[in-house]
Amino acid sequence: MQGRFRLPCFRASKIELMPTKLDEILANTLMEVNARKAAADYPALERKAAAHTPRGFVAGLRKAAASGPAIISEIKKASPSKGLIRADFDPPSLARMFEAAGAAALSVLTDGRFFQGSLEYLEAASATVRIPCLRKDFMVDRFQMLEARASGADAILLIVAAHTDETLSDLGDEARRMGLDILCEVHDREELKRAEGLGFKLIGVNSRDLRTFTVHPELVTELVQWKTTDAMMVAESGIGTAADIAKYRAVGYEAFLIGEALMRQPDPAAALAMLLEREYSTEL
């Protein structure tokens, strides 16, 4: 098993005439992943991965969606476009509160340079809750799947804009081999078609183009109309009120990833409970 993760890194994106922000992030990610691979204690990572039984990210969302909106609460400290989002940042505490407030799952940022995240945040958050957790990062190498499961992840993110169909398929296969579910992120009609063609069953729509970091709010409502499979759809942006959730549910979304709108609130869990229109007590 050890040798399997010493393969060369995948090519993460097509070369364009002018480098984009996504290209910059992917290049940095590849460099960091290669450094971690070179220093990795594979037997220890494999033992940690084996000790974590994936909790079924997609199954958890479907169960929640059967009786209401399935919320993926995101534990996010910062972003390249917004800078520091939350200074008072305690992932285990946030995880417990989000679970108590009704989150169906968690998303934890693990990119350090651009989002001030870490695998340690993921591990700490995952260890404190029963609901499944997503490793949200720029996945470019099979090794990251081992890291994800070893850190308590139950699912990983694959961003269509970062990959060819070949690398999407390869990384998807590796995630499934590791027992991890996949949230496949798209931001235009072509990417949706690619994600569906490759058989992804959980597809998220992000209105932010990661190549330019510009936002097109109308994408969330427009793209779902072009869905041609039974994939579960996740709205990943533009959600700030219960009315927003109702609007997106009406056009076909069942799950909702909410990050900044919650993390900027004095009490993120109370804000989540308000979105879900349910009562919440701070006494855990």
In which residue ranges do the predicted regions lie?
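Conserved, mostly hydrophobic/aromatic
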Residues: I25, S73, F98, A148, ...
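Active-site mouth loops of central-metabolism enzymes
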Residues: I72-D90, P132-V140, D181-E185, V234-G238
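Glycine-enriched alpha-helix->loop->beta-strand junction motifs that scaffold or abut catalytic
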Residues: G102-A103, T128-I131, A150-I156, R176-L180, ...
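An N-cap/entry alpha-helix motif that binds or orients negatively charged groups
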Residues: M18-R86
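Glycine-rich phosphate-binding active-site loops on the catalytic face of alpha/beta enzymes
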Residues: E147-T167, G204-F213, Y253-L272
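C-terminal helical cap(s) of enzyme catalytic domains, especially alpha/beta-barrels
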Residues: E222-W226, R264-L284
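Glycine-rich active-site/cofactor-binding loop and its immediate structural neighborhood
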Residues: S79-K136
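Catalytic cores of alpha/beta
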Residues: V140-S151, R189-L198, I239-I258
